[in-house]
């Protein structure tokens, strides 16, 4: 017998949509208003910089001949499916876990869209200190990192007792 979807973590799927809209919207604005390599300073230590990433985080495997596009697309799909199953199995009241899963799914789908549509991931956030620049990233990457950090944080928090879960 299936359980009502609103009682599961799938109730938090609206957050996936929010992450996707913000991520894809920001990438659209960059693609419409920047040429590849253009940079605009926002604040000290923060630029908007249009870059293309053909690999994964930190351009891992970016120069591997194209197969990595499909490899990373497959990983993104697999992770999304696993996290959706985990959301379905969790209670809607398990907020921290479900928010984390939704952020990761939204970020993974945003980058998956880029890989499938453009053949690369659009990156635009350039954080730097002095002459040292961190790897350029996007809002999907930020959502994935925040989601992963929330999962780690949840591991350090005390587990609710059976009475608190009821």
Swiss-Prot record:
Residues that span the membrane, as ranges: 12-32, 70-90, 102-122, 137-157
EC top class named in words: hydrolase
GO cellular component assignments: plasma membrane
Annotated keywords: Aspartyl protease, Cell inner membrane, Cell membrane, Hydrolase, Membrane, Protease, Transmembrane, Transmembrane helix
EC number of the protein: 3.4.23.36
Keyword Membrane: yes
Role summary: This protein specifically catalyzes the removal of signal peptides from prolipoproteins.
Entry annotated with the keyword Hydrolase: yes
Highest taxon above the source species: Bacteria
Similarity field: Belongs to the peptidase A8 family.
Pfam families (alphabetical): Peptidase_A8
Protein name stated in the entry: Lipoprotein signal peptidase
InterPro entries given in the database record: Peptidase_A8
Localization (cell): Cell inner membrane
Membrane topology of this protein: Multi-pass membrane protein
GO molecular function list: aspartic-type endopeptidase activity
């Amino acid at each position: 017998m299936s359980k009502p979807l609103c009682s599961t973590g799938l109730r938090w799927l609206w957050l996936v949509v929010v992450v996707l809209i913000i991520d894809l919207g920001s990438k659209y604005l960059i693609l419409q208003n920047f040429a590849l390599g253009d940079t605009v300073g926002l604040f000290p230590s923060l630029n908007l910089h249009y870059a293309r990433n053909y690999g994964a985080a930190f351009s891992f495997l970016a120069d591997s001949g194209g197969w990595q596009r499909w490899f990373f697309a497959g990983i993104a799909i697999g992770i999304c499916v696993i996290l959706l199953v985990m959301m379905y199995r969790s209670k809607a009241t398990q907020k921290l876990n479900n928010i984390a899963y939704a952020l990761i799914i939204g970020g993974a789908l945003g980058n998956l869209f880029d890989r499938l549509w453009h053949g690369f991931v659009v990156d635009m956030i350039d954080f730097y200190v002095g002459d040292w620049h961190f790897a350029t990233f996007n809002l999907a990457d930020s959502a994935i990192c925040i989601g992963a950090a929330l999962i780690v944080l949840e591991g350090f928090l005390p587990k609710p007792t059976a009475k608190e879960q009821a």
